[in-house]
Amino acid sequence: MIAVIATVRAKPGKGPELEADFRAWAEVVKQKEPGTLQYTLNRSKEDPDLYYAIELYQDEAAVQTHMANFQARPPGPDVAAGPPQILVLDRVV
């Protein structure tokens, strides 16, 4: 399995819009990507503009399917303060 942690900072005051966009996209992922085992958004308790998307994929093919779907989606609202930082991990346990 492959785990991904994406860190994204919302522009000040744009957190609710970022959450709504992620929520809508997560529904698409749930319906169209059976190899995506987990796809959640988490907000920092210390910094309300800092978010972590935690993703778990069955295999590399599932990651590639997700990336293709993500690149094909219409642009979301302009709510991020910059590009996400992406950490890709091999799940051990």
Please give the residue ranges for each predicted region.
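Absolute protein N-terminus
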Residues: 1-2, 93
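Active-site-flanking beta-strand signature of metal-NTP-handling nucleotidyl enzymes
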Residues: 3-8
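Short, surface-exposed ligand-recognition loops at beta-strand->loop->(often short) alpha-helix junctions
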Residues: 9-18
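An amphipathic, aromatic/His-enriched active-site/gating alpha helix that lines ligand/cofactor pockets
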Residues: 24-38, 54-89
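Short beta-strand micro-motifs enriched in acidic
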Residues: 42-46
